[in-house]
């Protein structure tokens, strides 16, 4: 399992400079499915789910409690809900 995590981290890093980043991200997802590993949330936010390309210069906006990430390659918009971390203080 440790080898699989190292391989996933290597693939996400190499996808930023690779000539074929779709292949790197596809391999990363296949390894995580085969080994039953949930990808880290930070890793999932580094690439577009539709075109499997790492974000190069995404347009990021905040709107109505969501973070909108617009992919510069395929034009897909990803919506991520902003978590409310306010905890009521004890009285």
Curated annotation (Swiss-Prot):
GO terms for cellular component: cytoplasm; ribonuclease P complex. Binds 1 zinc ion per subunit. The keyword Aminoacyl-tRNA synthetase does not apply. Its cofactor is Zn(2+). This is Ribonuclease P protein component 4. Part of ribonuclease P, a protein complex that generates mature tRNA molecules by cleaving their 5'-ends. Transmembrane segments: none annotated. GO terms for biological process: tRNA 5'-leader removal. Belongs to the eukaryotic/archaeal RNase P protein component 4 family. Keywords: Cytoplasm, Endonuclease, Hydrolase, Metal-binding, Nuclease, tRNA processing, Zinc. It catalyses: Endonucleolytic cleavage of RNA, removing 5'-extranucleotides from tRNA precursor. InterPro entries: RNP4. Consists of a catalytic RNA component and at least 4-5 protein subunits. It comes from Picrophilus torridus (strain ATCC 700027 / DSM 9790 / JCM 10055 / NBRC 100828 / KAW 2/3).
